[in-house]
């Protein structure tokens, strides 16, 4: 099986404060509730198509990648840190409203982008009618019983990313690498090839392909997860927030599962988890994630 991303009805670029640009792709129903959809660290939004394709018939879906990811041209210096990502998100929000007009909007974010959306909403401002957070790498404050588990988790990811291979002769090479990994064993059929296509770009020197998100940029974000001091209550946001974690009880589940369950309970969130999933739940069990998405949006008059 091979996924084919439909051509967007509209594209536009959002210029960022340092000259970087984010390429926005509009899909679906332009008259529907607007749903910006994006990705986690080192990944790319097109790879989440098994999830967001189910939204196209009803919603105005805006697909985009954060700086130095996906369809965006990497910049030097990279300015690849959470404070910058939050400011970038504000630019995306404001430019989208300016170009496409105001519209009821629910942001859908995963992992790094979910953490960015939390920081943006708490520190810059609430810009949504609702916010959906899929398995953000929520690190409790020091002294919390789960802090150490998240510290170990993020440090392991940081070291892994630093040693990650960055160049490939073909898309197939990375596809096979994904297929050989235990961590990707639950991805839906066709996802390994889709992910490889989404995260690679042609090497500027014309020799094969390279990761759009350089390993050092990916590693920096994992390391910064431990520095944010961001463990907010749901009441600190300016509107409804849905927190959806991976399975906290799953054998071998990442530390994000128990951490998000703890935040959900302690912070008074509308919290759910998707049974039998790891961190990439939207591409492991997209149908269940869509069910939770539509349920939450409907609850707040957005579906």
Give, region by region, the residue ranges found by the protein language model.
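Conserved HGGG/HGGXW glycine-rich cap/lid loop of the alpha/beta-hydrolase fold
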Residues: 23-74
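Flexible "cap/lid" loop of the alpha/beta hydrolase fold
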Residues: 122, 129-170
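Post-His helix in hydrolase/transferase enzymes
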Residues: 283-295
């Amino acid at each position: 099986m091979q996924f084919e991303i439909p051509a967007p009805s509209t594209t536009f670029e959002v210029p960022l404060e340092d000259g970087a640009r984010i390429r926005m792709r509009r899909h679906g129903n332009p008259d529907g509730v607007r749903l910006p959809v994006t990705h986690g660290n080192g990944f790319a939004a097109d790879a989440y198509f098994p999830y967001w394709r189910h939204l196209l018939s009803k919603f105005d879906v805006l697909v985009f990648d954060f700086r130095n990811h996906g369809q965006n041209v990497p910049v030097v210096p990279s300015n690849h840190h959470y404070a910058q990502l939050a400011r970038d998100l504000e630019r995306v929000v404001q430019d989208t409203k300016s170009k496409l007009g105001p519209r009821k909007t629910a942001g859908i974010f995963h992992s790094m982008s979910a953490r960015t959306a939390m920081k943006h909403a708490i520190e810059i401002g609430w810009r949504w009618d609702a916010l959906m957070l899929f398995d953000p790498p929520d690190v409790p404050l020091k002294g919390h019983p789960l802090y150490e588990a998240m510290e170990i988790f993020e440090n392991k990811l940081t070291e892994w990313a630093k040693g990650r291979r960055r160049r490939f002769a073909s898309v197939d090479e990375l596809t096979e690498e994904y297929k050989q990994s235990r961590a990707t064993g639950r991805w839906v059929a066709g996802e390994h090839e889709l992910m490889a296509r989404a995260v690679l770009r042609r090497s500027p020197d014309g020799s094969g392909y390279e990761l759009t998100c350089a390993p050092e940029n990916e590693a920096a974000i994992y390391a910064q997860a431990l520095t944010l001091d961001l463990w907010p209550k749901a009441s600190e946001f300016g509107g409804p927030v849905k927190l959806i974690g991976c399975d906290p009880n799953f054998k071998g589940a990442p530390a994000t599962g128990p951490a998000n369950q703890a935040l959900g309970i302690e912070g008074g969130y509308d919290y759910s988890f998707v049974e039998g999933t790891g961190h990439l739940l939207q591409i492991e069990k997209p149908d269940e994630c869509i069910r939770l998405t539509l349920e939450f949006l409907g609850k707040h008059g957005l579906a």
